[in-house]
Swiss-Prot record:
PROSITE patterns associated with the record: GATASE_TYPE_2 (PS51278), SIS (PS51464)
Lineage: Bacteria, Pseudomonadati, Pseudomonadota, Betaproteobacteria, Neisseriales
Protein's name according to its UniProt entry: Glutamine--fructose-6-phosphate aminotransferase [isomerizing]
CDD domains assigned to the protein according to its UniProt record, in alphabetical order: GFAT, SIS_GlmS_GlmD_1, SIS_GlmS_GlmD_2
Gene Ontology biological process terms, A to Z: carbohydrate metabolic process; fructose 6-phosphate metabolic process; protein N-linked glycosylation; UDP-N-acetylglucosamine metabolic process
Compartments reported by the entry: Cytoplasm
Glutamine amidotransferase type-2 domain residues: 2-220
Cross-referenced InterPro entries: GATase_2_dom (IPR017932), GFAT (IPR005855), GFAT_N (IPR047084), GlmS/AgaS_SIS (IPR035466), GlmS/FrlB_SIS (IPR035490), Ntn_hydrolases_N (IPR029055), SIS_dom (IPR001347), SIS_dom_sf (IPR046348)
Active site: 2, 607
Keyword Lipid biosynthesis in annotation: no
Gene: glmS
Domain SIS: 288-428, 461-602
Originating species: Neisseria meningitidis serogroup A / serotype 4A (strain DSM 15465 / Z2491)
Keywords of this entry: Aminotransferase, Cytoplasm, Glutamine amidotransferase, Repeat, Transferase
Reactions this protein catalyses: D-fructose 6-phosphate + L-glutamine = D-glucosamine 6-phosphate + L-glutamate
Function: Catalyzes the first step in hexosamine metabolism, converting fructose-6P into glucosamine-6P using glutamine as a nitrogen source.
């Protein structure tokens, strides 16, 4: 959700980095872009609505170049999608700012600054930042770091900010509070970005800023850094494991397609910690054993796709580990009165580790007295793991497509491993049980590959969906969250309205929607609820509904008029939800192709939701 880049380079033009970095951040979602570069003592800016390429072409036409600059992709929050609202924002020709986040008190700050004589050219909260820093800069005699320090004291909300000044061609100042920002170090060049993917083509050496950090950067690195208390601090520089190849499409048409097909490897990599070392608490942290022994229940907080992974985990935690488990949407949890249990394990799930609502929900839980927290996350050094006492990283690798695929299935693998580990700590897993769970996990990548091989059959269904306006997804038990995930994927990238229900709820309302124009997708594995699901399907068929069934090889389904059947591998036991996720991902992808939508960058959506 918005992307920030910046650079100060001793020997090279910054424009190539700024435009390349912004293109690598396109997956985060945006509607406009811009850069500002200090060129011969003047700040030159170019902004455009639409793709980064349009802005890049304009920058080259204007001959913009220089050794220091900042750039931004905007996802509109305050103000419409217009060029005046695009970043960077400039105050008095002196200060240029890019900003990710929301300044909650921008209206009162705007009135204050207007009273001081500043004129506003946009509707954004970011212009408040530019004028506020410029005001402090003028007051303190041109000290950029101190101007940012003073200005941010007035802001309420979340932000990541990068600032340059017309008369400071060798200083770039950044500040972070609640939104991701990193510093990357090269040879006589220093970069900043919202995401490591923006800098990986230039350097792998990165330092992640923490909330409250303000840093003064030069081409030879970090010259000054203070923490939230205003005290000098240091941030450890690490070498990123991200590969440039993981950010390229390769032979695939879209990142979503690539990431769907990367799932056997991603699942195997995530499962490796359990297959090599066993289901042991130490996989989650040094103190995990004592924590797992002391907890009496589990609460999981997440948003979007991660929330559906959490709903799936609830079944495993209660059936395998016999531990009471509760799942809540993070954005709802943080605004209600909660009865806290200090012996409850709070689990947060986020692909990016920077989802603001999830992060704030965790902070809220800790403020209520929750002592134990565990994050399931795909990005090392992100905010959630730093805020949690325990962590398990999924090994999905970079996920560029806005619609989550491999991040979801690797979250399921991690949560399954957690459930078995908790059960083992609680003395509920026999050697035979553990051997069975281990073998199911070992066989999972192959079962997922088998499901991927169904793609031609699933693609053939796409044309039948392409002209529909609504769809219904049904599942029962642990496969109900997979129906929810399938409906979410369809609406995200095809713009077809889709809902998911437990199949047993058909008669309580959804059946009224069923007719010959309503495709009904059914998740129908060969488990203890199969006969119930078949009965629900009869109800749909009796109303003229058209059924699209994802079944197991041994489910005894026959395709008939109005009933289309695709068979996944034979039932794979507890991990069946992972396998049945693949067909609903492929269905959404191919329907999107048939409808001609932007698969990787669906309208109005962002990959990482770092604001409320």
């Amino acid at each position: 959700m918005c992307g920030i880049v910046g650079a100060i380079r001793a020997h090279h033009n910054v424009v190539d980095f700024l435009t390349d970095g912004l293109k690598r951040l396109e997956y985060r979602g945006y509607d406009s872009s811009g850069i500002a570069v200090n060129t011969d003592g003047k700040i030159k800016r170019v902004r455009r609505v639409g793709r980064v390429q349009l802005m890049e072409d304009a920058a080259r036409e204007k001959g913009i170049s220089g050794g220091i600059g900042i750039g931004h992709t905007r996802w509109a929050t305050h103000g419409g999608v217009t060029e005046p609202n695009a970043h960077p924002h400039i105050s008095g020709g002196m200060i240029a700012v890019v900003h990710n986040g929301i300044i909650e008190n921008f209206e009162s700050e705007r009135k204050r600054l207007e009273g001081l004589g500043y004129r506003f050219e946009s509707q954004t909260d970011t212009e408040v930042i530019a004028h506020s820093i410029n005001h402090e800069y003028a007051q303190n005699g041109g000290k950029l770091f101190e101007a940012v320090q003073e200005a941010v004291k007035r802001f309420h909300g979340a932000y990541a900010i990068a600032v340059i000044a017309q008369d400071k061609p060798d200083e770039l100042v950044v500040a972070r509070m609640g939104c991701p920002l990193l510093v990357a170090l090269g040879d006589d060049e220093t970069f900043i970005a919202s995401d490591v993917s923006a800098v990986i083509a230039f350097t792998r050496r990165v330092a992640y800023l923490e909330d409250g950090d303000i840093a003064l950067l030069a081409s030879d690195g970090i010259k000054r850094l203070t923490d939230k208390s205003g005290l000098p601090a240091e941030r450890k520089v690490k070498v990123s494991e991200l590969s440039l190849a993981s950010l390229e499409l390769g032979p695939y048409s879209h990142f979503m397609q690539k990431e769907i097909h990367e799932q056997p490897r991603a699942i195997a990599d995530t499962a490796e910690v359990f297959l090599d070392g066993g289901f042991i608490p130490e996989n989650f942290g040094k103190n995990a054993k004592s924590v797992f022994e002391s907890i009496r229940s589990v609460k999981i907080l997440a948003c979007g796709t991660s929330y559906y992974a959490a709903l799936t985990a609830k079944y495993w935690l209660e059936s395998i580990a016999k531990i009471p488990s509760d799942v809540e949407i993070a954005s709802e949890y943080r605004y209600r009165s909660v009865i806290a249990d200090p012996d409850q394990l709070v689990i947060t799930i986020s692909q990016s580790g920077e989802t603001l609502d999830t992060m704030e929900a965790l902070k809220y839980a800790k403020s209520l007295g929750h002592r134990h927290s565990l994050s399931i996350c795909n990005v090392m050094e992100s905010a959630l793991p730093r805020e949690s006492s325990l962590v398990l990283y999924t090994r999905a690798g970079a996920e560029i497509g806005v619609a989550s695929t491999k991040a979801f299935t690797t979250q399921l693998v991690a949560l399954f491993g957690l459930a078995v580990t908790l059960a083992k700590v609680r003395g509920l897993v026999s050697e035979e049980d553990e051997a069975r769970y281990t073998e199911e996990l070992r066989q999972l990548p192959g079962s997922v590959q088998h499901a991927l091989n169904l793609e031609p059959q699933i693609a053939a269904w796409a044309q039948q969906f392409a002209k529909k306006t609504s769809a219904l997804f049904l599942g029962r038990g642990i496969h109900y969250p997979i129906a929810l995930e399938g409906a979410l994927k369809l609406k995200e990238i095809t713009y077809i309205h889709a809902e998911a229900y437990p199949a047993g709820e058909l008669k309580h309302g959804p059946l009224a929607l069923v007719d010959e124009n309503m495709p009904v997708v059914v998740i129908a594995p060969n488990d203890s609820l199969l006969d119930k699901v078949k009965a629900n399907m009869q109800e749909v068929g009796a109303r003229g509904g058209e059924l699209f069934v994802f079944a197991d090889l041994d489910s005894n389904f026959n395709a008939t008029e109005g009933v289309h059947v695709i068979r996944a591998p034979r039932h794979v036991g507890e991990l069946s939800p992972v396998v049945h996720t693949i067909p609903v991902q492929l269905l959404s992808y191919h329907v999107a192709l048939a409808r001609g939508t932007d698969v990787d960058k669906p309208r109005n959506l962002a990959k990482s939701v770092t604001v409320e």
